[in-house]
Structure formats: C-alpha cells, structure tokens
C-alpha cells in the first residue's frame, strides 16, 4: 500500500532512453501501488494533442494499460501545459488542478508542479500568467502545427539561455510562497517537482516539503505509505527491454 509521485521526465524523441526507463518503471514498480501521480513536465515540450510524436502515442497506450489497474493522475508542468483532454483520455490519465489537496493515509498533502512557487523569477512568472489565460491558449491552439512548434522551440531556446544567467536562489522556490500555500491549504506535506533538486525538507512550522527529482541521468520517485515517505533514485539499467 503506497502512492507514487514522479515528475520532470522531459520525455522526447531525442532521449528514448528515458522513455525506456519510464516504461520499465511502469512494468516493475507499480504492483503494490494505490495510485500514480505525474507532477508535470512529463514531456520536454507539448504543443498540442494533434502533434503527438509516435513515441508519445506508444506511451499513451502503455499508461492506458496501467490505468486499468490503478488511477493515474497528471498535473500540468511548464513544458507540457498544452497537454489536453484528448491525450489524457488516450493515456487513461485524469488531469488535476494545478494545486490539488490529498489525504495521504491520514496526512493532508498539497501537490503541484512547483513553478508557481518560484516567485523571485519575475520574468518567468509574467510568462506563466500569460500562458494561463484561456484566450491565449485558445489562440495558440488555432495556429498551424509548424508555427506552434516554432514558437515552442524559440521559447525553449530563450529559456535555456536566460537560465544560465539566473542565480540558484531565483531558480528555486521562495520560502514565503511555500509557507503561504501550506497555510492556505492547511497541509502537512507539500510535494512538487520543477526545480530538479530532489530532497525532503523539514520546515520550521513542522511541515515537510518534498521535491521529486528529474529523470535526466536517473529516475526519481517518491513513495508515500502509512509507514512514511521514501524518496528514491532509480538508476537507468542497460538491461531494460
């Protein structure tokens, strides 16, 4: 009896080794799981359900099989915020609000991707506010596939260049934002990703903030059970089929 949390896999056609590792995880690690939560950035980029790459469609079929055995939940990240109902249905995933509260074996828990907590990054927060507008998302969806892909590639390039010049503090969550969300939700645990800095933080207010890691060099999964929390690393195996 346990609930699993992952995020920041950044799956792409350029890194099929990560997709292979994730498929291996789905095949081998879920037998005793009550649910699987994917906390955003499942894909490196997602410009619309109508442009899903072949590897993504294969993954949808795999997740659909998993969803027949246990519920699979998804929260949008900053890379896959355009992932829609069409793909979610194909994958058997239920899309959750960007901030969701759970009762995890008697412990009130708030889960989210985590980018909303990086409030010191003013430029990114302005972009995040714009992209959250329904009108902006609708207009983007009306563009041609080629134009959407070009815009996404341009944003990724600028983001990568900009992040090289940002400090560690700006790129991390802001403590006041963390405390405010915990106070608003009355949660004891906060679980998020985004920062790629896996850790279990014991806060001064008695709460815990748990950060799931990325899947660039190895897998990262958080297991929560009635016995407690366990943040695990999953080495990529060359023997994965």
Curated annotation (Swiss-Prot):
Binding site for Mn(2+) 2: 41, 78, 113, 194
Entry cofactors: Mn(2+)
Binding-site residues, substrate: 78-79, 121, 159, 163, 166, 194
SUPFAM superfamilies to which the protein is assigned, alphabetical: Metallo-dependent phosphatases
Membrane topology summary: Peripheral membrane protein
Record field: catalytic activity: UDP-2-N,3-O-bis[(3R)-3-hydroxytetradecanoyl]-alpha-D-glucosamine + H2O = 2-N,3-O-bis[(3R)-3-hydroxytetradecanoyl]-alpha-D-glucosaminyl 1-phosphate + UMP + 2 H(+)
Enzyme class: hydrolase
Cell inner membrane among keywords: yes
Places the protein is found: Cell inner membrane
GO BP: lipid A biosynthetic process
Cofactor note: Binds 2 Mn(2+) ions per subunit in a binuclear metal center.
UniProt-listed InterPro entries: Calcineurin-like_PHP_ApaH (IPR004843), LpxH-like (IPR043461), Metallo-depent_PP-like (IPR029052), UDP-diacylglucosamine_Hdrlase (IPR010138)
TM helices/strands, residue ranges: none
UniProt-listed Enzyme Commission number(s): 3.6.1.54
Alphabetized UniProt keyword annotations: Cell inner membrane, Cell membrane, Hydrolase, Lipid A biosynthesis, Lipid biosynthesis, Lipid metabolism, Manganese, Membrane, Metal-binding
One GO cellular component term: cytoplasm
PANTHER family in the cross-refs: UDP-2,3-DIACYLGLUCOSAMINE HYDROLASE (PTHR34990:SF1), UDP-2,3-DIACYLGLUCOSAMINE HYDROLASE-RELATED (PTHR34990)
Functional description taken from the UniProt entry: Hydrolyzes the pyrophosphate bond of UDP-2,3-diacylglucosamine to yield 2,3-diacylglucosamine 1-phosphate (lipid X) and UMP by catalyzing the attack of water at the alpha-P atom. Involved in the biosynthesis of lipid A, a phosphorylated glycolipid that anchors the lipopolysaccharide to the outer membrane of the cell.
Family, similarity comment: Belongs to the LpxH family.
Name of the protein this chain belongs to: UDP-2,3-diacylglucosamine hydrolase
């Amino acid at each position: 009896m346990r609930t699993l949390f992952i995020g920041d896999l950044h799956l792409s056609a350029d890194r099929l080794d990560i997709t292979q590792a994730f498929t291996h995880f789905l095949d081998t690690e879920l037998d005793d799981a009550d649910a699987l939560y994917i906390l955003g950035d499942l894909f490196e980029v997602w410009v619309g359900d109508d442009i899903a790459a072949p590897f993504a469609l294969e993954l949808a079929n795999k997740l659909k099989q998993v969803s027949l055995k246990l519920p699979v939940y998804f929260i949008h990240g900053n890379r896959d915020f355009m992932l829609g109902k069409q793909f979610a249905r194909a994958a058997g995933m239920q899309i959750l609000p960007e901030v969701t509260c759970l009762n995890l074996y008697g412990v009130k828990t708030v889960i989210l991707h985590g980018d909303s907590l990086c409030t010191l990054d003013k430029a990114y927060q302005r972009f995040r506010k714009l992209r959250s507008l329904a009108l902006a998302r609708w207009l983007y969806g009306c563009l041609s596939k080629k134009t959407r892909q070009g815009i996404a590639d341009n944003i990724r390039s600028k983001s990568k260049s900009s992040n090289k010049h940002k400090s560690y503090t700006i790129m991390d969550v802001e403590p006041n934002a963390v405390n405010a969300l915990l106070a608003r939700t009355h949660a004891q645990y906060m679980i998020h990703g985004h920062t790629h800095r896996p850790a279990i933080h014991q806060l001064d207010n008695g709460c815990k903030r748990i950060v799931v890691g990325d899947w660039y060099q190895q897998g990262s999964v958080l297991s929560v059970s009635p016995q407690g929390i366990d943040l695990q690393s999953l080495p990529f195996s060359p023997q994965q089929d």
